[in-house]
A protein has these predicted regions:
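C-terminal helical/tail subdomains of lipid-metabolizing enzymes
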Residues: 3-4, 341-344, 360-445
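Extracytoplasmic/secreted cell-surface and envelope-processing proteins
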Residues: 100-103, 138-139, 207, 232, ...
Length: 445
């Protein structure tokens, strides 16, 4: 009997050891970038005055310096916008959405085609901000929408954007093992393929002229992410990451680090860390986990600079004869704000959840609803910071109803489904071709 127990114990111990070794081998751990000087070009993201009011009693509420790069960029955009013969200097906000970013890729490709020989799909953009998949788009759009680039280079940027959102199979983007195996692998997907794909999008076959063009862009571009340890929102200056890098290849790595940090959704994606000059690796999360901060930050700066510019010409609420006159002066002074929601604004019904109580399906549904509400709430809240300016929006709604035979209009648990992404690219084309165009205005307050 004792011998049997000893044998059972030995077998159990052996199996436990084998499982521990296997666990150690297959568990992904963190994907780490080592980018010298990375955090020199990363700024704190002030949540704006309204959220600061809400957080008044918090022990540490960050407030940005007014001379940070994004403040300066928006200040210049406002000043440029009101110059009599200067081109418009508007703002483009690109949201997150993972594979839904294929919608934005299709949209901007079609807008570029509609512009003819100019290859300039949206004129007058001075500042671009991106979160998650929007940060990946921001890299390409800093060149594709830059009037100082050649049409050939703008077309090259659009082509690389579309290529990035046109995988032939999901494994070209992530190693997707699913939520059920998260305890084993540490995340639902490994992102080493994404790192490789971003570098290839920027430097196809080692040709990094697109990276050089990003550094020389006349458009300021920023990618937002969140530090895991304290939850602070930060953003990277994409031009500076290029211009201060020792080579274009190193610059491409720095851009990949910033955009992957902006896309690293906890649990779903492999943890992402970036080590700067001091060698300390910092864990960074998808900027969407604090979605409102970048939008709020941008709009707070726009509002402040617009009111300052109006006051310099003697226009204040006290000086105008009516609210309507003040609102009109505000509208004329403020840059236009374009918003691309790379995703839908409503979720499909899921009646099967009335019959199933499993944690994975219910947890995924709750997450989807939270993300959806977070995204549309962030867009609606833009009006709090910019009460009278023009805010123009487009979304990936209609993906399952618009007339198309391209790809498929549904997905299951895939993170990057090629056929679905093809349908989303076609949706972008469809909305650009509509009689009234892809954009519609948000109501003013």
């Amino acid at each position: 009997m004792i011998d049997i127990l000893i044998c059972i114990g030995a077998v159990t111990l052996g199996l436990a050891l084998i499982l521990a070794i296997a666990f150690k081998i297959v568990r992904r751990g963190a994907l780490t970038f080592e980018i010298d000087g990375f955090y020199t070009h990363v700024m704190d993201g002030d949540p704006g005055p309204i959220i600061r009011d809400v957080q008044r009693d918090a022990t540490a509420v960050l407030e940005c310096k007014l001379d940070d790069p994004m403040s300066c960029s928006i200040k210049e955009a406002v000043e440029c916008h009101v110059e009599a013969e200067a081109p418009e200097c508007n703002v483009l906000l690109l949201s997150g959405g993972g594979q839904w970013g294929a919608f934005g890729a299709g949209l901007f490709k079609r807008l570029s085609e509609q512009s003819g020989a100019k290859e300039l799909g949206l004129e007058g953009i001075g500042v671009i901000t991106g979160i998650s998949t929007g940060s990946l788009q921001a890299l390409m759009m800093m060149v594709a929408l830059d009037p100082k680039q050649t049409p050939v280079m703008r077309r090259h940027a659009i082509d690389r954007l579309v290529w990035g959102y046109s995988p032939e199979k999901e494994s070209e983007v992530v190693r997707h093992t699913g939520l059920a195996l998260v305890p084993f692998f540490g995340s639902a997907a490994g992102t080493a393929p994404l790192r490789k794909r971003i570098i290839e999008a920027l430097c196809p076959d080692g040709d990094c002229r697109l990276v050089e063009a990003i550094g020389n862009s006349s458009i300021a571009g920023y990618a937002g992410f969140v530090e895991a340890d304290d939850g602070s929102f930060r953003y990277a200056d994409l031009r500076e990451l290029v211009n201060k890098a020792p080579s274009l290849e190193k610059a491409a790595e720095a851009l990949a680090a910033a955009t992957m940090a902006s896309s690293a959704m906890p649990v779903f994606h492999q943890q992402l860390r970036v080590a700067g000059s001091d060698g300390k690796a910092v864990s960074l999360y998808d900027g969407g986990v604090r979605r409102s901060v970048f939008f709020d930050r941008t709009m707070a700066i726009v509002d402040r600079q617009v009111r300052k510019e109006m006051a310099s010409h003697g226009v204040t609420k006290a000086s105008t004869t009516s609210q309507e006159n003040f609102a009109e002066e505000y509208r004329k002074t403020a840059p236009k704000v374009y918003v691309v929601r790379n995703g839908p604004t409503v979720r499909k019904p899921a009646p099967e959840l009335n019959r199933k109580s499993g944690p994975l399906k219910n947890g995924q549904r709750g997450y989807d609803l939270l993300v959806n509400e977070s995204e549309i709430g962030a867009i609606a809240a833009l009006r709090l910071g910019n009460p009278y300016g023009e805010i123009l929006l487009t979304t990936a709604d209609m993906y399952d109803t618009f007339p198309s035979t391209v790809g498929e209009n549904f997905k299951d648990d895939e993170m990057f489904k090629p056929a679905f992404m093809a349908r989303l690219r076609d949706l972008g084309r469809f909305k650009a071709d509509r009689k009234d165009g892809p954009w519609w205005a948000l109501s003013t307050l």
